[in-house]
């Protein structure tokens, strides 16, 4: 795995050097838009709706809207913002493990010890023994995150999972649920029996993404066979040459007599006959 961040966890007076790695990866089959008629890939260009010209990345800015008014900020403007130390994970507080609402949980990362393992093991064991998690602040890709730091797995691996800020979570507003019906004992009993019948230890490996499996099968069924062009006549000649036993060349005088040329048994062989012989033996 390739580290996405390197820094340290500040745990009181203890500094825990770590490297951060993405804990998840996607295995979805990637695709792109194409023209149905000829299979050509679809390309997009950034075009200004005011002047109609194509805009290069270096000329892009961001417009923010507040109370109906807009402000255009450039990369230089954003660079002036004060930023937190992007090499430190600051522990804010420790809370009981069950108090963090799962709806707040976002992207997970693994932390590996960088350098000495002792401070890493100390923090991991402390969290595990106390059955608590650490609420931390960390800056990733120039953006500050609130995150939870906890211990996972039999090797007590520190796992950091970013949290959504409270204002990013919507309140459920479902008036229909304000007046729930009374449930009978019989209904509750049957429902409880069904839960007991379907109860089992959670094993994610026994579940599979059926859509992904069927999509791959569909794609493979439409793959065009790759044709490898080859010179059939040339290949046949090479095969015949490989299996045909090589015959010894006949003596030039024997060959010449077989061809009807008149030459002496000991005299010099004319050059034109030598040339014909060599051409025939090539």
Swiss-Prot record:
One of its GO terms (biological process) is symbiont-mediated suppression of host innate immune response. Residues 9-189 form the Ku domain. The gene is 206. SMART domains: Ku78 (SM00559). Homodimer. Interacts with host LigD, maybe via the LigD Pol domain. PANTHER family: NON-HOMOLOGOUS END JOINING PROTEIN KU. GO terms for molecular function: acyltransferase activity; double-stranded DNA binding. Required for replication of viruses with short cos ends (4 bases). Stimulates dsDNA end-joining by host LigD; in conjunction with M.smegmatis or M.tuberculosis LigD can reconstitute NHEJ in S.cerevisiae. Binds dsDNA with either blunt, 5'- or 3-overhangs, protecting it from host exonuclease degradation. The keyword Glycosyltransferase does not apply. Transmembrane segments: none annotated. HAMAP family: Prokaryotic_Ku (MF_01875). It comes from the Viruses. This is Protein Ku. The keyword DNA-binding applies. Keywords: DNA end degradation evasion by virus, DNA-binding, Host-virus interaction, Inhibition of host innate immune response by virus, Viral genome circularization, Viral immunoevasion, Virus entry into host cell.
């Amino acid at each position: 795995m390739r580290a996405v961040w390197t820094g340290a966890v500040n745990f009181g007076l203890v500094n825990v050097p770590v490297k951060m790695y993405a804990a998840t990866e996607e295995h979805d089959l990637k695709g792109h838009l194409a023209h149905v008629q000829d299979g050509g890939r679809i390309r997009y260009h950034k075009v200004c709706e005011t002047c109609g010209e194509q805009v290069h990345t270096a000329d892009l800015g961001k417009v923010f809207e507040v109370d109906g008014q807009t402000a255009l900020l450039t990369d230089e403007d954003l660079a002036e913002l004060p930023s937190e130390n992007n090499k430190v994970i600051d522990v804010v507080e420790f809370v009981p493990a069950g108090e963090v609402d799962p709806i707040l949980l976002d992207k997970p990362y693994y932390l590996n010890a960088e350098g000495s393992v002792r401070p890493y093991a100390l923090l991991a064991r402390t969290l595990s023994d106390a059955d608590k998690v650490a609420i931390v602040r960390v800056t990733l890709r120039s953006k500050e995150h609130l995150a939870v730091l906890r211990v996972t797995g039999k090797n007590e691996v520190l796992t950091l999972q970013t949290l959504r800020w409270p204002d990013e979570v919507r309140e459920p507003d479902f008036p229909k649920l304000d007046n729930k019906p009374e449930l009978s004992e019989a209904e509750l009993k049957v429902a409880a029996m069904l839960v007991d019948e379907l109860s089992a230890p959670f094993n994610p490996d026994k579940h599979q993404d059926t859509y992904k499996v069927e999509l791959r099968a569909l794609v493979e069924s439409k793959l065009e066979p790759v044709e490898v062009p080859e010179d059939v006549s040339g290949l046949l000649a090479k095969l015949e040459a490989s299996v045909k036993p090589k015959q010894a060349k006949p003596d030039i005088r024997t060959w010449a007599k077989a061809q009807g040329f008149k030459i002496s048994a000991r005299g010099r062989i004319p050059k034109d006959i030598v040339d014909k012989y060599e051409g025939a033996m090539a």
